[in-house]
């Protein structure tokens, strides 16, 4: 949620900042702005709405080689031009952009700023006014910046300009992602490396409660007490072409099509020369020593976790619980004696999951992160990490990250089973290869799936997805995809629960998408379809080859029964995509949603 960029170098800062913000659009935002410094002062341009709107108001006549930029997701104050970042101090000396939530900003206003008239409703403006107050009291800018950050409770990633010293950007971080990119004669600031790949692929990780003093030729990292910190940059495992649509009309469609290649990439990364699964011995040992596994996740990652539970319990005979991250700490379950926590997050920055991880580490328990972003907060703070190797996922609605998470969970479950001496009776690597081929087949059936979306969903108000056993978990994900991008009220239900209330919502023409990929519940789910059809529903049955019947709407290529979620979700992704397209929705950037949820 939100995004920050900063640039100090020799090129036109305006265009670099705007391009950087465009690369952060996937994170979700409702307004955007930039500030660039010149000898005459700091020039601010900001607007409610898209970055394209911001571009229209930027004065191209202003020449600058230093600046900061921001995309805002409203948390304090409505989406508006006034509340958009950047914000300035009362005298306009200091200019700030900020991601995160300052939990004690009201108290800080009462304690320090009663004589200041604030111009916005944001928590951010309090921060920049505090810096100015402490400078007026005689502190240096650096000392005032550190003093201010030491007072803040909550999360923040901050970049600050001083119009009396336009050769410096002051940066601070706590519980919100922020990187500093380095290059000869040029340095940059970004919430995400993707934003500044146009400038450099060398980045410094900034830890919580650190500040960075960034000039054109130097980067100095310090703790809040002023202690200098030494750190080497790392090379971002990204290519600029990874974050372009190429010939695709939308990132979501591109990322759906990339799924077969992602699965093959995962196989390559986690396969020994003899064809067996290769995981770090430390991870294997941690899983083996655990008497219960607790999977913590949110949204799509939570749905992957539900499938992961089935895989681990069925393969490795190890008990697993799956919890929604935002709810876990409110009523923590009675933990087993030797728990292992697995955190699943595409970005590795999910605030709710990080909150649980912090508490878990305080209790002394081991944690494993499954993420698509190496070097992310969850990756750094957990004991172990499994990387999903899916490549950048730009569309807000997750597709390839979901199937990648399930593939990695498959390998984790299979490796644990092997370590326990359990014979699965099949080769997981080989079966995942079959899955990749099946995915490719499905991605080539877009016309059929577009027709289903047009016939069933283009004009509907609501839709229900039903399934049993593992299919139910995929139905939850299919419903989420549809509601995320098409704004259709969609819900996933266990087939057996229909008669316990949901069937009351069925009326003439209600679309029902039913999954039938599991032999042991095939007759039961078909019975549910007959129940709703008898009450006027418009059923769409998606079945597995070998279980299909003549009137089924769509038939999936056959894969191993435990791995059906990796293929059955693809038609649901494509149906959601085409439904959104036919309804005129913004597929890649749906309203009110953010890709990376970095505030609680």
UniProtKB/Swiss-Prot annotation:
Location in the cell: Cytoplasm
CDD domains, per database record: GFAT, SIS_GlmS_GlmD_1, SIS_GlmS_GlmD_2
Domain (SIS) ranges: 283-422, 452-590
GO-annotated biological processes: carbohydrate metabolic process; fructose 6-phosphate metabolic process; protein N-linked glycosylation; UDP-N-acetylglucosamine metabolic process
E.C. designation(s): 2.6.1.16
Keyword Transmembrane included in the entry's annotation: no
Substrates-to-products reaction catalysed: D-fructose 6-phosphate + L-glutamine = D-glucosamine 6-phosphate + L-glutamate
Claim: 4Fe-4S is one of the keywords in the record: no
Residues covered by the Glutamine amidotransferase type-2 domain: 2-217
Keywords noted in UniProt: Aminotransferase, Cytoplasm, Glutamine amidotransferase, Repeat, Transferase
GO function terms (MF aspect): carbohydrate derivative binding; glutamine-fructose-6-phosphate transaminase (isomerizing) activity
GO cellular component, as recorded: cytosol
SUPFAM superfamilies: N-terminal nucleophile aminohydrolases (Ntn hydrolases), SIS domain
Active site residues per record: 2 (nucleophile), 595 (for fru-6p isomerization activity)
Source domain of life: Bacteria
Subunit structure: Homodimer.
Record's function text: Catalyzes the first step in hexosamine metabolism, converting fructose-6P into glucosamine-6P using glutamine as a nitrogen source.
Name of the protein described by the UniProt record: Glutamine--fructose-6-phosphate aminotransferase [isomerizing]
């Amino acid at each position: 949620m939100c995004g920050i960029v900063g640039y100090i170098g020799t090129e036109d800062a305006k265009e670099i900042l705007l391009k950087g913000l465009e690369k952060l659009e996937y994170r979700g935002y409702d307004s955007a702005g930039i500030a660039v410094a010149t000898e005459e002062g700091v020039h601010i341009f900001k607007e409610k709405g898209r970055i394209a709107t911001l571009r229209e108001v930027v004065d191209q006549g202003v020449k600058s080689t230093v600046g900061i930029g921001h995309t805002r997701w409203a948390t304090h104050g409505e989406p508006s031009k006034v509340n958009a970042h950047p914000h300035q101090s009362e005298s306009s000396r200091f200019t700030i952009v900020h991601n995160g939530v300052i939990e004690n900003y009201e108290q800080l206003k009462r304690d320090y700023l009663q004589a200041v008239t604030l111009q916005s409703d944001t928590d951010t403006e309090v921060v920049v006014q505090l810096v100015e107050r402490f400078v007026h009291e005689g502190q240096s800018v650096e000392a005032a910046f550190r003093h201010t950050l030491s007072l803040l409770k909550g999360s923040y990633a901050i970049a600050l300009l001083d119009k009396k010293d336009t050769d410096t950007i002051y940066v601070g971080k706590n519980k919100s992602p922020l990187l500093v990119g380095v290059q000869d004669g040029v340095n940059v600031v970004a919430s995400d490396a993707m934003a500044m790949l146009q400038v450099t692929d060398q980045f410094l990780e900034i830890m919580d409660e650190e500040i960075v003093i960034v000039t054109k030729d130097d980067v100095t990292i310090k703790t809040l007490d002023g202690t200098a910190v030494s750190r080497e940059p790392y090379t971002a495992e990204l290519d600029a072409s990874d974050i372009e649509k190429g010939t695709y009309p939308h990132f979501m469609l591109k990322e759906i099509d990339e799924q077969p290649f992602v699965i093959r990439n995962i196989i390559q990364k986690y396969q020994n020369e003899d064809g067996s699964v290769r995981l770090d011995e430390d991870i294997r040992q941690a899983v083996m020593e655990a008497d219960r596994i607790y999977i913590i996740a949110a949204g799509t990652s939570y749905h992957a976790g539900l499938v992961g539970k089935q895989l681990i319990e069925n393969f490795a005979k190890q008990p697993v619980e799956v919890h929604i991250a935002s709810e876990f700490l409110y009523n923590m379950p009675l933990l087993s004696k030797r728990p292992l926590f697995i955190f699943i997050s595409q970005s590795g920055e999910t605030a709710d999951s990080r909150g649980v991880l912090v508490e878990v580490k305080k209790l002394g328990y081991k944690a494993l992160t499954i993420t698509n972003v190496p070097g992310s907060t969850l990756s750094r703070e957990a004991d172990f990490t499994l990387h999903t190797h899916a490549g950048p996922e730009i569309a807000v609605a997750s597709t390839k990250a979901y199937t990648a998470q399930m593939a990695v969970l498959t390998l984790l479950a299979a490796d644990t089973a092997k370590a326990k001496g359990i014979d699965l009776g099949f080769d997981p690597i080989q079966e995942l290869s079959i899955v990749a081929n099946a995915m490719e087949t499905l991605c080539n059936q877009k016309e059929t799936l577009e027709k289903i979306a047009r016939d069933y969903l283009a004009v509907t108000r609501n839709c229900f997805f039903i399934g049993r056993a593992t299919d139910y978990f995929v139905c939850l994900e299919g419903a989420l995809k549809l509601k995320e991008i098409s704004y259709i009220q969609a819900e996933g239900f266990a087939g057996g629960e229909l008669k316990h209330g949901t069937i009351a919502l069925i009326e003439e023409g209600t679309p029902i998408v039913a999954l039938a990929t599991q032999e042991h519940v095939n007759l039961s789910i078909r019975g549910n379809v007959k129940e709703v059809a008898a009450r006027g529903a418009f059923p769409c049955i998606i079945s597995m080859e070998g279980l299909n019947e003549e009137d089924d709407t769509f038939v999936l290529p056959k894969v191993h029964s435990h791995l059906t979620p990796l293929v059955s979700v693809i038609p649901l992704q494509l149906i959601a995509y085409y439904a959104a397209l036919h309804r005129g929705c913004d597929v890649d950037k749906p309203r009110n949603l953010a890709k990376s949820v970095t505030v609680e």
